Swiss-Prot record:
GO cellular component: ribonucleoprotein complex; ribosome
Bias (Polar residues) ranges: 41-54
Classification of source organism: Bacteria, Bacillati, Cyanobacteriota, Cyanophyceae, Synechococcales
Function: One of the primary rRNA binding proteins, this protein initially binds near the 5'-end of the 23S rRNA. It is important during the early stages of 50S assembly. It makes multiple contacts with different domains of the 23S rRNA in the assembled 50S subunit and ribosome.
GO terms of molecular function: rRNA binding; structural constituent of ribosome
Protein name: Large ribosomal subunit protein uL4
The UniProt record lists the keyword rRNA-binding: yes
Name of encoding gene: rplD
Region (Disordered): 40-85
Family: Belongs to the universal ribosomal protein uL4 family.
Chain segments annotated as coiled-coil in the UniProt record: none
Keyword annotations: Ribonucleoprotein, Ribosomal protein, RNA-binding, rRNA-binding
Amino acid sequence: MANCIVRDWQGKEAGKASLDLKVAKEASALDLMHRAVLRQQAHSRQGTASTLTRSEVRGGGRKPYKQKGTGRARQGSVRTPLRPGGGIIFGPKPRSYNLAMNRKERRSALRTALMARIEDLVVVKDFATTLTTPKTKEIIDALGRLDVSATSKVLIILTNPSEAVRRSIRNLETVKLIAADQLNVFDLLHANKLVVGEDALAKIQEVYGDD
């Protein structure tokens, strides 16, 4: 179990919260998180790269010149991979890059990654609830009050962020917003700081704390 200090929108201490998630064994934790990140990155690939082989490129199979008497290497087709406009040897073809990983392993990797970043986690009560119109400066100032730089890689985790909050955050290149029930290992490990709403922390405990 990890205890966290809860801060309000002004950056002042407003209580305490706890997070109790079951993590993987130390001997296998690093490998588990590594496989989860590899799987996530592999699944983001479209796998649509495609090249034409000598049987698919445009043009006939005409023999460019006679077999003997030219002094040149023999050629059997104008579409051989050795000639301009010919086919590609061992080029990419559409394929799936998906990697298999058990559901229990995926959830364990996510819980382990989250608990590993507990020192970089900032819990905020009522994050931007007073924000009615998009104001990026308000988000920057609030992060500053929480001792979090808006120019560093920040992951903000909320339950149901309003449209004003979404539009305020999307102007910040290094700040990413994600829902509490849609966490992923890559974002948790990639960010320098995790800013979590108090209700989002409770949602995380509810969704991922049942194993």
